[in-house]
């Protein structure tokens, strides 16, 4: 039986260190980090954003985390959803062409909100921890996209990037390999996003990225609470790659 890809991912996420990153990689991480923040600020004028903010505020209470380009404070989950939407809604966010994945919207929005929340509680994240987590998130999301061979039916910038966000959050949380594996499985249970919104050009397209970013946070929370997830995520008979990416 082939080794489960989620297990390979878990080992990779767990064992990778900042020191493994080349100088070129670190430089590019910083470039795309700043680029994504800039795109998120530009997206603060996005379509239906006021409506989104009004409803997102009712979904979860709290004013712990920042929305890009504003002085607004929302709960961790609400700010993640809004920031992911702002980053992707103009479709200026960076893309891995070969993977057909915009990785940073889901990954950075969830990572920023989580780090801001734990910082408010006195648990500080240093730059090296942040960058290796970001790198691993992009690595996993892009790898999933590159492996896909079939016609694009589900919205890969949302589906693949959700797993990338879990990878980044798992690293920043210093999860064990077993915990990372559980988090990936729990994320699979929540993964969503289709191409119909892309075909029709409706604003919910960008929100699909936000839904998965928020789901990544829920996956982290459930894992921390000791909740198990399915283990056969990428190799099982009901696998992600068959359902969402049509991998051969």
Each predicted region: which residue ranges?
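Beta-strand segments within the central parallel beta-sheet cores of soluble alpha/beta enzyme folds
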Residues: 124-138, 177-189, 199, 231-238
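Generic N-terminal targeting/processing segments that precede catalytic cores or assembly contacts
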Residues: 1-101, 113-120
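Flexible, glycine-rich active-site loops centered on histidine and acidic residues
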Residues: 136, 140-155, 189-217
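Single conserved hydrophobic/aromatic residue that forms the stacking wall/gate
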Residues: 240-248
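Acidic/serine-rich, low-complexity amphipathic helices located in mid- to C-terminal regulatory regions
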Residues: 167, 171, 175, 194-234
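Active-site nucleophile and cofactor-binding loops and adjacent substrate-binding regions
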Residues: 99-106, 129-134, 150-162, 205-209
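Alpha-helical support elements that line or immediately flank enzyme active sites
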Residues: 36-43, 103-128, 163-175
């Amino acid at each position: 039986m082939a080794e489960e890809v989620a297990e390979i991912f878990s080992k990779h996420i767990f064992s990778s260190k900042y020191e493994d990153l080349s100088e070129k990689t670190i430089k590019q991480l910083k470039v795309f980090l700043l680029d994504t923040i800039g795109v998120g600020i530009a997206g603060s004028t996005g379509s239906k954003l006021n409506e989104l903010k009004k409803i997102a505020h009712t979904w979860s209470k709290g004013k712990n985390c920042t929305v890009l380009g504003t002085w607004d404070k929302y709960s961790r989950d609400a700010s993640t959803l809004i920031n992911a939407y702002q980053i992707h809604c103009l479709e200026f966010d960076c893309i891995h062409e070969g993977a057909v994945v915009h990785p940073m919207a889901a990954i950075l929005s969830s990572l920023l909100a989580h780090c801001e929340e734990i910082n408010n509680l006195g648990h500080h994240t240093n730059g090296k921890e942040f960058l290796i987590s970001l790198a691993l998130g992009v690595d996993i999301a892009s790898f999933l996209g590159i492996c896909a061979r079939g016609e694009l039916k589900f919205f890969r910038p949302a589906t693949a990037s959700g797993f990338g966000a879990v990878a980044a959050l798992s690293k920043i949380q210093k999860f064990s390999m077993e915990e990372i594996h559980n988090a990936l499985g729990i994320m699979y249970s929540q993964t969503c996003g289709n191409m119909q919104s892309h075909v029709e050009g409706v604003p919910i397209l960008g929100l699909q990225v936000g839904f998965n970013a928020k789901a990544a946070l829920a996956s982290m929370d459930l894992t921390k609470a000791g909740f198990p997830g399915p283990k056969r995520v990428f190799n099982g008979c009901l696998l992600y790659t068959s359902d969402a990416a049509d991998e051969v």
